[in-house]
Each structure stands twice: as C-alpha cells, then as structure tokens.
From Swiss-Prot:
The keyword Lyase applies. The lineage of its organism: Bacteria, Pseudomonadati, Pseudomonadota, Gammaproteobacteria, Enterobacterales. The keyword Iron-sulfur does not apply. Pathway: Quinol/quinone metabolism; 1,4-dihydroxy-2-naphthoate biosynthesis; 1,4-dihydroxy-2-naphthoate from chorismate: step 3/7; Quinol/quinone metabolism; menaquinone biosynthesis. The gene is menH. This is 2-succinyl-6-hydroxy-2,4-cyclohexadiene-1-carboxylate synthase. Pfam families: Abhydrolase_6 (PF12697). One of its GO terms (biological process) is menaquinone biosynthetic process. It catalyses: 5-enolpyruvoyl-6-hydroxy-2-succinyl-cyclohex-3-ene-1-carboxylate = (1R,6R)-6-hydroxy-2-succinyl-cyclohexa-2,4-diene-1-carboxylate + pyruvate. Keywords: Lyase, Menaquinone biosynthesis.
C-alpha cells in the first residue's frame, strides 16, 4: 500500500523534495512554495487520514513511516530532502531518526521534537482525545473555529482563521480523529538526542511570531531560519520568506 501523492518531475540528477503537510492539510498545502523549485523533482504527499489518503488507516508512527517508504519506492525516489510542517514535520523527524534510506537532508517547519515527561504526555493524551471526540461527532466548521483559537495560532487574523476553517472543514472528521490519536505527541518519543546525532543537514523554520516553536528550535541541533511576518504556519503566512530560506538551504 502507498500514500496518495502528486509528483512533479524535475531535472535528472537533482535530489527530490518530498513535502509533508500539517494536520488537516493535504498535498496542495506546500505547492505554492514547492513549485518555485521546478528544477527539482517534487513529491507532495497526502498523509493517512487526509486528502486522497483519507481511507488509509494507521495505528501509529511506524505505520506512517512504512507507508512513506513504500510511496518513495513506488516513485523511484532514491535521494531526497524531507520538508515537513507541524504534523508533517514530526513524521519527517521520526523518519529521519529511524534512518529512512536515501534521505539527504531534513527541513522542519514548526514541528515538535517531543514531550519530555510522562505528565506532559498524559495531559496531551487527554487533550487530543477530547479533540478527536469533537472531530468525530461535531460539525467540522464548529470544531475548526475553536481549533484556530488555540494559542499557537494567536498570530492569525480573523480573516485568516475564517479561511482556514472553511478549507479544513472539507476533511473527514472520523479519519482526522483517527490520525490525531495515532500520531499524538503523547505517543511520540522525545527525539532531541537522536536529532542531535543526525549525520546529514537539519534545518528548522519558524515564524518570528511563533514564540513557542522558536524556543523549541533552540533545543535541537538544527540551523534555524526565522521567517519574518509569520506565525506558526509560516509557509502559508509568508510563502516568499519560506521560499527564500529553502533556496538558501538547498543552495539553489
């Protein structure tokens, strides 16, 4: 089994860019950024529970990474950079720490390296469980209205929140809930030590108004790029800034 994806070919001999979206996003999320790198092969993946992969069930990160590997093989992608946002960033970090073959470099935007104690994990398990129940049983417009009131999204304007709520409400609440539980921070290990031992380039992107993830970026051995005029979802709020950072990282 493989994940649904959109593949855009590039010039032979260049590493592929593999983009992983955030929770409730899909393969289109990264395209305004990725399509600026038309010289590279680009693969935009729908994670399980999302988009064209909505019907694919997983029990945890191991299943997600196995599907990711199968998808890369199916597209004959042998050398690549992983670029992931939020949930996609956490999947990318997990894959990198487990030694996914062919990985040349890692770029994470606003991805959490992991909680560091059992109390924090227990609190997150309860929180994610409550959200999952809401995704299963309530209208998605109401759930996402509240979702985007969370402190991490404080930099969004009312108009941006409204647009995101309308966009994300096109998802399937049941499959979102299942993926939220399967890949909760409560079940993700603390990756800091493993990330600090990576043998390939690791870069971290965060919006200048995203104080939580700017602080987390200092806890991992990554070169940090702060994106101006952006909060947690930097590639949506300032795509040109993220393009500039990626161009520097990839030396394009």
């Amino acid at each position: 089994m493989m994940l649904h994806a959109q593949h855009m070919p590039g010039q032979p001999g260049t590493p592929s860019l593999v983009f992983l979206h955030g929770f409730s996003g899909d393969c289109h999320e990264w395209q305004p950024v990725g399509e600026q790198f038309h010289g590279c092969s680009r693969l935009y993946i729908d994670l399980p529970g999302h988009g064209g992969s909505a019907a694919i069930p997983v029990d945890g990160f191991a299943d997600v990474i196995r599907l990711l590997r199968a998808t890369l093989i199916s597209y004959n992608i042998l050398k690549f950079w992983l670029v992931g946002y939020s949930l996609g960033g956490r999947v990318a970090m997990m894959a990198a720490c487990q030694g996914i073959p062919g990985l040349c470099g890692l770029v994470v935007e606003g991805g959490h390296p992991g909680l560091q104690n059992e109390q924090a994990r227990a609190e997150r398990r309860l929180s994610d469980g409550r959200w999952a129940e809401r995704f299963r049983h309530e209208p998605l417009t109401e759930v996402f209205h509240d979702w985007y009131q969370q402190p991490v999204f404080a930099s969004l304007t009312a108009q941006q929140r409204q647009a995101l709520t309308a966009l994300r409400s096109q998802n399937n609440g049941e499959t979102l809930a299942a993926m939220l539980e399967a890949t909760s921070l409560a079940v993700q290990p603390d990756l800091r030590e493993a990330l600090n031992a990576l043998a390939f380039p690791f870069y971290y992107l965060c919006g200048e108004r995203d104080s939580k993830f700017r602080a987390l970026a200092q806890e991992v051995a990554a070169t940090c790029h702060v994106i101006r005029n952006a909060g947690h979802n930097a590639h949506r709020e300032n795509p040109a800034g993220v393009v500039d950072s990626l161009a520097q990282i990839l030396r394009l």
